[in-house]
């Protein structure tokens, strides 16, 4: 493992990287938020179904 080479590679990537524009950031935030809400809603539906069915779940 060549540490100086690895560090130079990381520095080169960080120099090429740029911060996203406000529009890009908002779009990514909305998509990530929608995904989190979708997963939460699916989990809630599973919990509700398991709670309503007799003999299934705790």
UniProtKB/Swiss-Prot annotation:
Q: Which residues cross the membrane?
A: 36-56
Instruction: Tell me the keywords, alphabetical order.
Output: Cell membrane, Membrane, Protein transport, Translocation, Transmembrane, Transmembrane helix, Transport
Subunit-level organization: Component of the Sec protein translocase complex. Heterotrimer consisting of SecY (alpha), SecG (beta) and SecE (gamma) subunits. The heterotrimers can form oligomers, although 1 heterotrimer is thought to be able to translocate proteins. Interacts with the ribosome. May interact with SecDF, and other proteins may be involved.
State where it is primarily located.
membrane
Q: Which branch of life, at top level?
A: Archaea
**Which Gene Ontology BP terms does the record give?**
intracellular protein transmembrane transport; protein secretion; protein targeting
Q: Which Gene3D superfamilies match?
A: Preprotein translocase SecE subunit
- Give the species this sequence originates from: Halorubrum lacusprofundi (strain ATCC 49239 / DSM 5036 / JCM 8891 / ACAM 34)
Membrane: present as a keyword of the record?
yes
Protein name listed in UniProt: Protein translocase subunit SecE
Q: Does the keyword Nucleotide-binding apply?
A: no
Membership in a protein family:
Belongs to the SecE/SEC61-gamma family.
| Record-level Gene Ontology MF annotations | protein transmembrane transporter activity
Identify one Gene Ontology CC term for this UniProt entry. Answer: plasma membrane
Q: How does it sit in the membrane?
A: Single-pass membrane protein
Q: What does this protein do?
A: Essential subunit of the Sec protein translocation channel SecYEG. Clamps together the 2 halves of SecY. May contact the channel plug during translocation.
**Where is this protein found?**
Cell membrane
């Amino acid at each position: 493992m060549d540490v100086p080479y690895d560090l130079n590679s990381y520095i080169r990537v960080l120099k090429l990287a740029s911060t996203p524009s406000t529009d890009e950031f908002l779009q990514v935030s909305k998509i990530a938020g929608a995904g989190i809400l979708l997963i939460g809603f699916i989990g809630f539906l599973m919990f509700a179904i398991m709670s309503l069915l007799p003999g299934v779940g705790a």
